[in-house]
């Protein structure tokens, strides 16, 4: 079995509670796999930093039920425990579609118990009414217990525990307000773990918090994985000839879905990570520039001459480059930071990136208007947007037509650049197309030059 950590709403402390659970299990030398419901990148990076293994996203909009079931069972093989962190409130799904793609949807699909994290601050016995509603709203979702968070005092804890037990639920942990470990936030959520120099100390604090705050006699049987039947295949990925593909990974570029990287490897890609912030540019036959926060280190990045020369040269030669969000932001002529400073960037696209205050957020259905190194014109895909920047001017021949009547994305030869984050789990053809384009460079030593 495994457990799903959920809550009535966002902001209750799900991530901190999840990390504390993972840190305790890791400290006790258990092989633990973590998962995250939804499209988020930052929480999974914290999970991975604690467990030492990639965290896997379970997203029923970006993929589908058979894939989520298959990837869950695949990644549980050889593990001793598993913890899934939910997203938003337990029943919060895609806007306008009820609880579709919600944490509850995943719980029903995988038939896993839910532990509800309750924010006790400012509440007393009224918590019983909250639990009454959540327990009965959908009987197919089994709430196995409650962890109380941000509790004010022992007297407060007693009142809240009475509320929990009045609903026939197990109290699995109590975290007091003065013990809460706060993780730093900024404009798009948590500050990524790569930027926290003392996270190892934080991890130790989280493990200690879990040890003294949680009822492990009750929790351990819930998180322990039982042997299951062989997992169904996640995708049809007949290997292609090997080809070296470079993946940018540092403080500027770090947003990648674990399953996407594993799919590329299954197709024959030999993935090599590199750091643009260190001025690195490996000689490979394809490049991934993922999302991240290039705006926060734009000045440092702008000075990396070797990286820019390598990037411009590769695109000019037609080497496939797949850039998402943060990767797109650095391809224009300049990037204007939140403080208003403008820094020269690649100059590959005739546009510049401007940081704003409006967050563009949500799932999208996208139809490709033009072919790129990863998509064919006319193909429809599902993706996710999450950014506060904009590229101006907009492309004359955009890559995507989105279902909100917006158009976006750039395509030039073998360059694919877009704000849209894609999960290739049920769209393996896109990854295969990208690898084939990279192989064309490897075998022929050339490809179609990009024209601007």
Curated annotation (Swiss-Prot):
Gene3D superfamilies assigned to the protein according to its UniProt record, in alphabetical order: 3.40.50.880, P-loop containing nucleotide triphosphate hydrolases
InterPro entries, per the entry: CbiA/CobB_synth (IPR004484), Class_I_gatase-like (IPR029062), CobQ/CobB/MinD/ParA_Nub-bd_dom (IPR002586), GATase_3 (IPR011698), P-loop_NTPase (IPR027417)
Keyword Nucleotide-binding among UniProt keywords: yes
GO biological process, one term: cobalamin biosynthetic process
Pfam family for this entry, one: GATase_3
Catalytic activity: cob(II)yrinate + 2 L-glutamine + 2 ATP + 2 H2O = cob(II)yrinate a,c diamide + 2 L-glutamate + 2 ADP + 2 phosphate + 2 H(+)
Family the UniProt entry places it in: Belongs to the CobB/CbiA family.
Domain remark in the UniProt entry: Comprises of two domains. The C-terminal domain contains the binding site for glutamine and catalyzes the hydrolysis of this substrate to glutamate and ammonia. The N-terminal domain is anticipated to bind ATP and cobyrinate and catalyzes the ultimate synthesis of the diamide product. The ammonia produced via the glutaminase domain is probably translocated to the adjacent domain via a molecular tunnel, where it reacts with an activated intermediate.
Protein name (record): Cobyrinate a,c-diamide synthase
Organism: Gloeobacter violaceus (strain ATCC 29082 / PCC 7421)
Lineage: Bacteria, Bacillati, Cyanobacteriota, Cyanophyceae, Gloeobacterales
Gene: cbiA
């Amino acid at each position: 079995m495994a457990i799903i950590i959920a809550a009535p709403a966002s902001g209750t402390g799900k991530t901190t509670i999840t990390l504390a659970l993972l840190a305790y299990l890791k400290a006790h030398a258990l092989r633990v796999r973590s998962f995250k419901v939804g499209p988020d990148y930052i929480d999974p990076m914290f999970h991975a930093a604690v467990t030492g293994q990639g965290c896997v996203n379970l997203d029923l909009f970006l993929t589908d039920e058979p894939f989520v079931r298959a990837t869950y069972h695949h990644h549980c093989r050889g593990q001793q425990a598993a913890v899934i962190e939910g997203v938003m409130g337990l029943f919060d799904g895609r806007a306008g579609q009820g609880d579709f793609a919600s944490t509850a949807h995943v719980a029903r699909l995988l038939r896993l118990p839910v532990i509800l994290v309750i924010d006790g601050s400012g509440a007393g016995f009224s918590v019983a009414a909250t639990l009454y509603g959540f327990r009965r709203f959908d009987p197919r979702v089994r709430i196995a217990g409650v962890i109380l968070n941000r509790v004010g005092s022992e007297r407060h804890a007693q009142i809240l525990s009475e509320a929990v037990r009045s609903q026939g639920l197990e109290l699995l942990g109590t975290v007091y307000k003065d013990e809460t470990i706060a993780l730093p936030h900024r404009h798009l959520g948590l500050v990524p773990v790569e930027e926290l120099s003392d996270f190892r100390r934080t991890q130790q604090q989280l493990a200690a918090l879990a040890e003294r705050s949680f009822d492990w006699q009750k929790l351990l049987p819930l998180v322990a994985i039982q042997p299951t039947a062989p997992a169904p295949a996640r995708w049809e990925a007949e290997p292609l000839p090997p080809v070296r593909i470079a993946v940018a990974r540092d403080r500027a570029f770090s947003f990648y879905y674990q399953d996407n990287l594993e799919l590329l490897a299954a197709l024959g890609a030999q993935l090599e990570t590199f750091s643009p912030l260190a001025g690195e540019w490996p000689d490979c036959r394809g490049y991934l520039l993922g999302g991240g926060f290039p705006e926060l280190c734009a000045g440092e990045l702008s000075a990396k001459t070797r990286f820019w020369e390598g990037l411009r040269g590769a695109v000019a030669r037609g080497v496939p480059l797949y850039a998402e969000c943060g990767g797109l932001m650095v391809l224009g002529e300049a990037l204007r930071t939140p403080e208003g400073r403008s820094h020269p960037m690649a100059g590959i696209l005739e546009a510049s990136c401007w940081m704003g205050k409006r967050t563009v957020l949500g799932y999208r259905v996208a139809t490709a208007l033009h072919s790129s190194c990863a998509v064919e014109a006319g193909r429809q895909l599902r993706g996710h947007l999450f950014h506060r920047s904009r590229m101006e001017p907009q492309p004359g021949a955009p890559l995507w037509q989105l279902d909100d009547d917006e158009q976006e994305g750039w395509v030039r030869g073998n360059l694919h650049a877009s704000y849209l984050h894609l999960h290739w789990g049920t769209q393996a053809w896109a990854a295969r197309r990208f690898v084939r384009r990279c192989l064309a460079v490897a075998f022929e030593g050339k490809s179609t030059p990009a024209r601007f």
